[in-house]
A protein has these predicted regions:
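Sec-dependent N-terminal signal peptides
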Residues: 6-15
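Formylglycine-dependent sulfatase
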Residues: 2, 17-443
Length: 443
């Protein structure tokens, strides 16, 4: 079966575009989220905008990624398997074919291909397909050199949501403080990704409205650290007080009712026993914060949708939402800091944040707080939500990010395109397997 038959069947694209007009494309990629986190895939987290896209679009129940950040992005951007694209693992060079840790220069990215077809290409968010992350470069594998006309985001893969490492506008390192183009009252990276995407769309409408566009919206939600705004955390207070199992059972029941999994599907073995889990209040707060991060991302997706509706381009736009891997069981920040851990010095507001892994102090000199009892959410914390909640995120599957089990590689896929999906197909679920390499072939 050809690699694009999957979408030609599912989306019923042929014959749906009048007058040969080219559709716009929006790919939304979230980070370190599980199969059943969002509402339209069984989750209790409030994601009304993604749910709306699913209601009037298509859901794919057996779509697969590459289990890690970099390989998934390399495959998505190239339409190739990750080893063919040069990033079989992460961005370290293993001195082996397929493991160069760098997006191959002999491949055409989706943005480069669409540019040749007359598209304007925009990216907001996480890049993570090059080992060259320093401000001095080399930059031949940065977004602007791989087909994107404008870029706002981070070159590397993780960091504070209040002070992102490797933050750039186009080819220039910036900080939240010295970026004259974007000065919100409170800087939060997920909001910044959404807001800059909306700005790109506004500017496109003013200067290039006659051209189709491709927007790659690559969130770092919900990669550790668990950073979220208080107003979003408040929505989820009390929701997770019962621990892991009640949420897993409720999600599986909803997945079955929706028809996303078969009626005889069983839960995978639980990874942690809630009754024996210490620091329950801390664990609850970690998941409340995680849910708040996802909620905030959905709010931003809503702003993108609203802008396209205002421009009367929503119906002409194909939206695809998916995730880079499963929920993450890594234990980052879940243990108390050792002596000598906080060794960095405070930074000036406009001093470039070059450190890939987090500094041990905030810019204003507050020590970073990690370990049990340090409640997630604020800027001066740096905590992962842990194995127990990752098991919840990946309901009903076993294992996590990193693994080639369903818990590591199964992703929701939502496709929405008012002019391209027949009315009789809207709201339906497609159970045919698909993979990242199918996306570029479809475009």
């Amino acid at each position: 079966m050809s690699c694009n038959r999957f979408f030609l069947i599912g989306l019923l694209v042929l014959g749906s575009i009048t007058s040969g007009a080219k559709p716009n494309f929006v790919i939304i990629l979230s980070d370190d989220m599980g199969y059943s986190d969002i509402g339209c895939f069984g989750g209790e987290i409030q994601t009304p905008n993604l749910d709306s896209l699913a209601k009037d679009g298509l859901r794919f129940s057996q779509f697969y990624n590459a289990a890690r950040c970099c390989p998934t992005r390399a495959s998505l951007l190239s339409g190739l398997y990750q080893h063919q694209a040069g990033i079989g693992l992460m961005t370290g060079d293993k001195k082996l074919p397929g493991y160069q840790g760098e997006l191959g220069r002999n491949i055409l990215t989706i943005a480069e291909a669409l540019g040749l077809a007359g598209y304007q290409n925009y990216m907001s968010g996480k890049w993570h397909v090059t080992k060259h992350t320093r401000p001095e470069g080399p930059k031949e594998n940065w977004p602007r050199q791989r087909g994107f006309d404008r870029f706002y985001g981070t070159i590397t893969g993780a960091g504070s949501f209040y002070d992102p490492a490797t933050l750039c506008r186009d080819n220039t390192y910036i900080t939240p403080a010295n970026d004259s183009d974007y000065q919100p009252e409170t800087y939060y990276y997920t909001d910044a990704i959404s807001d800059n995407a909306v700005r790109f769309l506004k500017d496109h409408e003013m200067s290039d409205a006659e051209k189709p566009f491709f927007l790659y919206l690559a969130y770092t939600t919900a990669h550790w650290p668990m950073h979220a705004l208080p107003r979003d955390i408040k929505k989820y207070q009390g929701m997770y007080d019962g621990g892991f199992d009640p949420i897993r059972k409720a999600r599986l029941k909803k997945l079955k009712a929706m028809g996303l999994v078969s009626s005889d599907t069983k839960l995978s073995p639980g990874s942690d026993n809630w009754e024996k889990t210490p620091h329950k209040e801390w664990e609850i707060r970690n998941m409340e914060t995680y849910a708040a991060m996802v909620d905030n991302m959905d709010q931003g997706i809503g702003r993108v949708i609203k802008e396209l509706r205002n421009q009367d381009k929503f119906k002409d736009t194909l939206f695809l939402y998916l995730q880079d891997n499963g929920g993450c069981a890594e234990g980052y920040g879940r243990y108390a800091a050792k002596n000598g851990y906080r060794e960095d010095q405070p930074m000036e507001p406009d001093e470039l944040q070059k450190k890939i892994w987090p500094p041990m102090q905030t810019r204003d000199g507050r020590p970073l707080r990690v370990g049990p009892g340090e409640m997630a959410g604020p800027e001066d914390t740096f905590i992962g939500y842990g194995r127990g909640w990752a098991n919840v995120s990946n309901t009903p599957f076993r294992e996590y990010k990193h693994f080639a089990h369903e818990g590591g590689i199964a992703t929701p896929l939502i496709a929405h395109w008012t002019k391209g999906i027949a009315k009789k197909m809207r709201g339906k679920i497609d159970h045919q397997p698909g993979h990242l390499i199918d996306l570029m072939a479809t475009f």
